[in-house]
C-alpha cells in the first residue's frame, strides 16, 4: 500500500500533465470546422483524460489485491542490454555533444530544403486501395468518359429568358471550346449542345449544321428545340423555368489539387473575358471544385490547429516551470523531429493533405510527454544535488531514460500497425507518426541533455529555474542510508 501511495504521489502530477498535453494535441482538431475532425478531437481528448482517471483509480485498487511482485517479475529491469543502452546514452551525451549538435544542425538544414519541396495536393481516390474492384471501375470510367467528378459552371444572366439570347449562347459556346482543350476535362454538356443538335436535326442531320443558329434562324430553331421531345422538355436539364439561369456541366479526371487550381485559374480568366460582370454572375461548383476548395480549407485549418497545439503546450510548460528559457529548451527537441519528418515528406514526394497534416499535432502532443518527465526529474535532481548540473542531468537521464525508451517503442509499434491498412491515408499516418515519435525519442534522450549541459550557467539557478507552480514530482524523501548516517 505504501509503495502504491508513493508511486501516485511521485508520478501522479507528471502523468496528469503529460495526459493534458497529449489531449491538447488532439483537442486542437475541434477548431477545424470539419464535423468528422471535430468529433475525432472531442472523443480522443476526452478519452485520454478518462483513461488517466481510470488508471489513477483502478490500477492501484487492482494492485492492492495482488501479491508482491517476485524477483523474476522485475528481472527485465536488470537486463544487460538495458544497462548497455543507458551507458551508451551517457557516453554519447558526455563525450560527443558536438557530434549531436552537428547532426541536429545538418538534419535541420537538409530538412528545410526538403520542406520547400512539399506540395499541398491530394486527389479524391489516391488513398483508396488500388486492388479494390471499385477502383478498377473508376479507372474504366475515367478512361472512357474522361472523368468521374462533375465540374459545373453556373451562369446567372440577371434577366428572364436571358440564357436563350444568341449573345449569351455564343459566349457559352466559346467557354465550352476552352473546356474541350483542357485534357483533364470531358466534353461539356449544356443548352448550347442542345441548340446545335436542334439546328443539325432541322437540316436533316447534316453534320455541317452542328452550330449555333444565325439571328434569322434563332426563333424557329429554339422553338424546334423546345418541341424536340413530346415527353420531356430537354431544356429543363440545362436552364431553369424562367430562362435566367443556366449551367455547363463537365467531368474532371482524378487529378491533384495543384492541377485543379491551374484549371480553375484558366477557366476563371476566360470567364472574366467572355462574361461582363455587370451583365452576368458566374460561379464554379460541382464535386471537383468543392473537393479542391475543401482540401485547401482543411489543410489551412489543420496547420492552424498545429500552431495552437504548440502554443497551448508552451503555456503548460510555462505554467509548470515558469521560465521562458526552459520553454525554448523543451520545444527544440520536439519541434526538430516535426521538421525532419516534414523534410522527409518533401524528399519522398508525400504531399501535404488532410491525412498527412494530422501527423504533426498528434505526434507533438505525444512526444512532449518525455520532455516533461525528463525536465521534472532534472529539477528534482538539482534540488537533491544542490544545483550540481552534470550530476543532475545524468541522474535524471538514468532515472527516466529507460521509461522514455519503453514508452516510445510501444507507441512506435502501436502506430506502425496502421501500415497494414489498405487505405493510403491511414498508411501514411502510421508511417509518419511512428517515424516522428522515434526521432522525438532520440532528441529527448540525446539533444535535450546536451542543451541542459551547454546552457547550465544560464538556466541552472534559482532565478531562472524557479519552483514550479505545480509540484510535478515531489522532492525525494531522505533515503534510509542518509537517516542512519545522521543518527
Regions found by a protein language model. Give the residues of each.
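Hydrophobic transmembrane alpha-helices and their membrane-interface caps
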Residues: 1, 326-375, 416, 443-446, ...
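Pore- and gate-forming transmembrane helices of large, multi-pass membrane proteins
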Residues: 2-32, 331, 366, 383-421, ...
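Alpha-helical membrane-interface segments at transmembrane helix boundaries
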Residues: 4-12, 16, 37-41, 45, ...
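Membrane-water interface of transmembrane alpha-helices in multipass transporters/channels
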Residues: 29-46, 126, 323-333, 347-362, ...
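Extracytoplasmic
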Residues: 97-354, 453-487
Amino acid at each position: 500500500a505504501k509503495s502504491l501511495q508513493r508511486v501516485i504521489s511521485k508520478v501522479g502530477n507528471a502523468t496528469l500533465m503529460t495526459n493534458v498535453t497529449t489531449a491538447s494535441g488532439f483537442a486542437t482538431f475541434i477548431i477545424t470546422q470539419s464535423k468528422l475532425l471535430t468529433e475525432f478531437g472531442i472523443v480522443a481528448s476526452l478519452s485520454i483524460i478518462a483513461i488517466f482517471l481510470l488508471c489513477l483509480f483502478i490500477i492501484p485498487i487492482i494492485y492492492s489485491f495482488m501479491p508482491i511482485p517476485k524477483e523474476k517479475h522485475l528481472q527485465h529491469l536488470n537486463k544487460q542490454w538495458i544497462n548497455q543502452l543507458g551507458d551508451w546514452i551517457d557516453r554519447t551525451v558526455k563525450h560527443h555533444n558536438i557530434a549531436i549538435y552537428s547532426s541536429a544542425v545538418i538534419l535541420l538544414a537538409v530538412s528545410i530544403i526538403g520542406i520547400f519541396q512539399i506540395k499541398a495536393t491530394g486527389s479524391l481516390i489516391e488513398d483508396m486501395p488500388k486492388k479494390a474492384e471499385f477502383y478498377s471501375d473508376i479507372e474504366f470510367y475515367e478512361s472512357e468518359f474522361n472523368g468521374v467528378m462533375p465540374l459545373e459552371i453556373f451562369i446567372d444572366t440577371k434577366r428572364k429568358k436571358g440564357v436563350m439570347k444568341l449573345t449569351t449562347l455564343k459566349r457559352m459556346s466559346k467557354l465550352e471550346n476552352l473546356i474541350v482543350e483542357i485534357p483533364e476535362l470531358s466534353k461539356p454538356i449544356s443548352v448550347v449542345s442542345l441548340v446545335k443538335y436542334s439546328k443539325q436535326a432541322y437540316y436533316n442531320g447534316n453534320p455541317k449544321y452542328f452550330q449555333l443558329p444565325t439571328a434569322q434562324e434563332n426563333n424557329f430553331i429554339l422553338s424546334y428545340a423546345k418541341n424536340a421531345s413530346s415527353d420531356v422538355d430537354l431544356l429543363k436539364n440545362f436552364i431553369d423555368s424562367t430562362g435566367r439561369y443556366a449551367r455547363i456541366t463537365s467531368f474532371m479526371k482524378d487529378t491533384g489539387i495543384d492541377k485543379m487550381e491551374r484549371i480553375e485559374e484558366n477557366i476563371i480568366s476566360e470567364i472574366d473575358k467572355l462574361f461582363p460582370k455587370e451583365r452576368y454572375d458566374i460561379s464554379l461548383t460541382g464535386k471537383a471544385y468543392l473537393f479542391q476548395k475543401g482540401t485547401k480549407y482543411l489543410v489551412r485549418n489543420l496547420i492552424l490547429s498545429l500552431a495552437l497545439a504548440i502554443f497551448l503546450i508552451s503555456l503548460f510548460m510555462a505554467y509548470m516551470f515558469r521560465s521562458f528559457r526552459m520553454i525554448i529548451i523543451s520545444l527544440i527537441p520536439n519541434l526538430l523531429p516535426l521538421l525532419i519528418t516534414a523534410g522527409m515528406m518533401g524528399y519522398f514526394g508525400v504531399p501535404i493533405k488532410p491525412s498527412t497534416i494530422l501527423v504533426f499535432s498528434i505526434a507533438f502532443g505525444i512526444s512532449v510527454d518525455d520532455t516533461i518527465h525528463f525536465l521534472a526529474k532534472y529539477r528534482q535532481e538539482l534540488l537533491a544535488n544542490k544545483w550540481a548540473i552534470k550530476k543532475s542531468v545524468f541522474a535524471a537521464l538514468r532515472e527516466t531514460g529507460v521509461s522514455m525508451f519503453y514508452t516510445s517503442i510501444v507507441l512506435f509499434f502501436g502506430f506502425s500497425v496502421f501500415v497494414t491498412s489498405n487505405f493510403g491515408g491511414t498508411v501514411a499516418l502510421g508511417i509518419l507518426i511512428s517515424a516522428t515519435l522515434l526521432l522525438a525519442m532520440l532528441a529527448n534522450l540525446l539533444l535535450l541533455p546536451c542543451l541542459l549541459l551547454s546552457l547550465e550557467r544560464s538556466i541552472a539557478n534559482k532565478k531562472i529555474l524557479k519552483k514550479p507552480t505545480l509540484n510535478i514530482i515531489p522532492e525525494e524523501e531522505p533515503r534510509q542510508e542518509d537517516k542512519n548516517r545522521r543518527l
